[in-house]
Structures are given as C-alpha cells and as structure tokens.
Amino acid sequence: MKIKLINIVALAALASSVPAIAQKTVNGVTMQRGFMGQKVTPEEMAVIGKGAFKGAHRVAITVFNVAFPDENHLVAKTSGHAGGFVSSARSDLRTTMTGVDRATRQRIADQAYKTFVAQLTAAGYEVVEAPELARLAPEYATWTPQPNFSQGRFGTYVAPTGRSLFWWPGDTMKRNATGAFDYSMSALQMMTDRPQAFGRTPMVGYIAQVGTIAVTLVVDYGVYSTSGVSGKGFGGKASAGFLPGVTVAAGVGIDRATTLNYWKPNSGGFGALAVLQIPVRSEAAFITDRGVEGAVDAAIVADPIKFEAAASDVINQALPKFVSVMLENH
C-alpha cells in the first residue's frame, strides 16, 4: 500500500508539471517546443521503450480497435493584460459527419486488420491469431469485451470481424475541447487508467510466450488547426480551422490517437509505445453535402463508398510506419 501511495503521489506531481496551455496545432500536427521554447514540428513517430522490440518474432494481437469520430469540437483561447488593460479572444469550431454506416466501418476495420497481419508476416513475424492465443493463454478468452460500435473518446469503436472490442487507456475519457496536450487532471486520469486488456496483455504474452501487440487506429474525416490556449498574449487572436479529408489521425504525449503498444514475452510489464505524430491524410473527394446547422460549423455528409476507399488508402500508408518501427528496433 505504501508503494502504491508513493506511485500515486509521483503521478500527481508529474501531472501538475504539465503546462495548462493547449499546444498550437497545424493541420492535425501538434507543434512541440524546442530547447529555447520555440515551436517545432514533431517527428513522424514518437517511440518510447524501443528496447522492448528487440528479438521479437512470434507475436499476437490482443487488441485491434478502429475508431471513427462522428463529431469534433475545438476551442482556441487567448488572454493577456498590459498597463491595467485586459484582452481576450476565443474561437469555437464544431464539425460533424454522417453518411458512413456500420457495415462500411466494419469493412474498413476488417481490411485494416488483414493488412496489418499481412505486413507483419511479410516483415518476418509469425502472427498467432486470437483462437490460438486463447488456447495458449486461456485467460485471454475470459476478458470482458465491449459491444462492437461502442462510443468512446474518438467516436465509434469497431473491432474486426471475429475479434472482440476491448477498451484501452483513455478510450472512455472525454476529449479536451481545447486540444490541450493536456491539463493536469486529464494527465493524471490517463496515467492511472488501466482497463483490463491493458493490465493483462503483458501476462497473457508471458503465459503464451509470445510478443503482444495492441493497436488503435483513429480514422477521422479531416484535420484541424488551432492557435491553442495561451494566457500570455495581450491583444492576441484565437483561431480554429478544419480541412476535410479522410485521415489516420495523429496525436502527441497524453492526447495521443493512433498508437501501437508492444510487450515482449518476458517483459516484466515494461513495453514499447509508438505514437503517430504526423497524420496521414487523403485528398480524395468523399463529401456529398456540406453545410452549417445551428452551432455546427461544418456538417458533412459522406459518400460511404468514397470514404471507404480513402480510408483504405490512408490506413495502407499508416500501418507500415508501425511495422517499420518494430523492425528498426528489432
């Protein structure tokens, strides 16, 4: 209990050190800050715990979730004071998308999974499918799944046909509308969120003696730009913008989106995390109608056939990036 208490205090201290500002985002890329405080474009992929990939050969995928946002809301704010005067500005952006039915989303998820397995196999990995994993580690079959098409942090979550949907850290949290990288309480919640699949995946891998992989793909209908949130800009402007296009969404730090987690068989619970930081966006047309409805700035109606084609294209570009990370650190 004492150790647990110390860990919680440490997490709280770390969370409190996260700046209470939202980073500037440009076309889906969250800008980071360099050594001197200047804004810099992040690398395509952030990888933590690279050493965990070493020696990987026989692997199993415990979680493969594809999330489809149905709406997005961003807020940009700035405020400041000088000479006794105070200024503030705010910009709100709300978008929605309809027109893509469940069957289309299921096909996209199915194809994404098949593509990922094929890419792993081509890269020299032996992929243990879910039924065999349950035989090797019976506990896997006892996990409590969520209903397919459940609503989570990034909209509608879909598992490939024949697989179960399991929550991953942050999936049930509400997104921060400011696009913040993140506020302290959100940071603490993310770090202490331990769904069953996340907590038990390393043990299942240990019992089955396979490396274990968990993937979350976020397939959005556009990318966003925001000036973020700042309390240091007197007379500053706030802006938020939207560029349509089927996209494998990126994230950064705690506000991550498309990710891959990996644990080697004898990981001791220490694994690797790869986070996509540069989105993969298609310029292919997919919108049949676009308008403004009430408080919504962009109400998009998608052509499901065109959306599916564009989604397959960007997924086929995004997934190899994760396989490459695994190979580069093998």
Report residues per predicted region.
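Bacterial N-terminal signal peptides that target proteins for export
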Residues: 1-8
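N-terminal signal peptide c-region/cleavage motif recognized by signal peptidases
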Residues: 17-19
